[in-house]
Amino acid sequence: TEDISEKRKIMAKIILKKSREDSLKRFHPWVFSGAIAQIVGNPAEGDVVSVYSSEGEFLAAGHYQIGSIAVRVLSFETDVINDAYWEAMLSKALEVRIATGLAQDGGNTNCYRLVHGEGDNLPGLIIDWYDGVCVMQAHSAGMFRAKKQIADALVKIYGDKLKAVYDKSSGTAPFKAGLDLIDGYLYKKEGFNDNEQVVLENGHKFLVNWTEGQKTGFFLDQRENRKLVERYAKDRNVLNLFCYTGGFSIYALGAGAVHVDSVDSSAKAMALVDKNVEIGGFDKSRHTSLCLDAIDYLKDIPADKYDLMIVDPPAFAKHRGVLRNALRAYQRLNAAAISKVA
């Protein structure tokens, strides 16, 4: 059994400045570096640390990291972050998805976000489920270092349903933390050798490649927006700019759009759009794939060509220094799009 008292002796402590504990008492998931009075011990990036008020009251435990967000809180109740903790937290996340109808066996959706960072009280962690394959991305050093425990917990809670756990953190984990950022499988069921598979979302089929695709392979967080497009697409000519693998395009076709044009500068993405149109069984004459710069295409089209337009550009700002320019670019893009909708 784990010697908890011994573990507490060696765990680093974060002591907050006077009156800086209020946000934690309201269950805010972060401790900012400016709130810290003292660090007792010498924690490495990703270590679990305990957080105390200036009066010595235990407040939380979480992952330590150098930067403006010094601690990402894992628990407000205990500083024991062990295998049982990971199993309990991931089980709770799955129970929420079952309760909301996302994780129902035999339904018309078999892909969903299992863990959405702070929303599931697991800051720094994303896990997406693709019909038996869990793809995880760590956005903090602590979550990256805990990836084996996380994978083991997923094996326990999903059992035979789990085909694989794939870690795709090389583009999301903090590179300054000196981590070994190589993507790869943390678990594979015997006989499973695929890097892609067809999944269902609201009855629509999509081919997802988690090793080569953006993010975890598919933008699951856009599900409700895709359903929104479905409401308006019938009998309309639709343009999907920055289409990636064509999620919005497939929903528009399924809703009865007259014609859909999908535009993206990535040839790989456009090949997947064509594949998704094919596996969806749609008439190919109703869809055109255009491997072009979306902004250039938008400039050249007549103002009455489309009745419905989806504009979902990539992030223009990766850091605060370019935020103002990015906001201006979004404004120009949206204004141009609005001017071209009939």
Q: What positions do the PLM features span?
A:
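A short, sequence-level motif marking secondary-structure junctions
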Residues: 63-68, 141, 211-214
